[in-house]
Amino acid sequence: AIVSSDEATIEFAVNLGPDHAQLDPTGRLVAINTGTLVASVGTASIVDTGSKPSGGAALNWGRWEGPGSTIAQQLPNGAVVRNDGGNLHYIYGVVASELPTAGIVEYAPVGGTRPTDSATGEVGNLVSGGRVAVNFTIAQVTLNSLQVGFNNATYTMGGTASLLGPLFSTGGAGATATCTGSACQP
């Protein structure tokens, strides 16, 4: 699962069972406890939900919106960041039984949540899903030309990340972002 509620908090979790992630009967994430991230949807709305099954695997996504949720994450330095009532984006999947072990495969987005501004909560739009290329030979993923738009600001993002243990990491300088428009924020 990948869960994020603001620019400072993103959580990658693997092999989450029912003790750590709770789903409602339709497969929407309603609570998660990874040890460093503890969140519950409470009375907040779950929006932008979707699912894409394929070949025995499936991706599922959604976003919590509005007051009523509790979201707390402990950062590596021990500080706890709270974003109660904020947007929480999630994506989780059933692992595919067959994946390539070598070569490069390009993927196109099949769906997802609308982007949100972590400072204001404004909901934007996906302008372009870009391209995702996975190099299975060297365990690397590259994102090209993902664009999200807000009122008077369009952000274009890209970058390369390598697999470090079970997680992808940009290694500090692997991501780039630009913005056009009068409302661009750092």
Language-model region placement:
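Mature soluble binding/inhibitory domains
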Residues: A1-P186
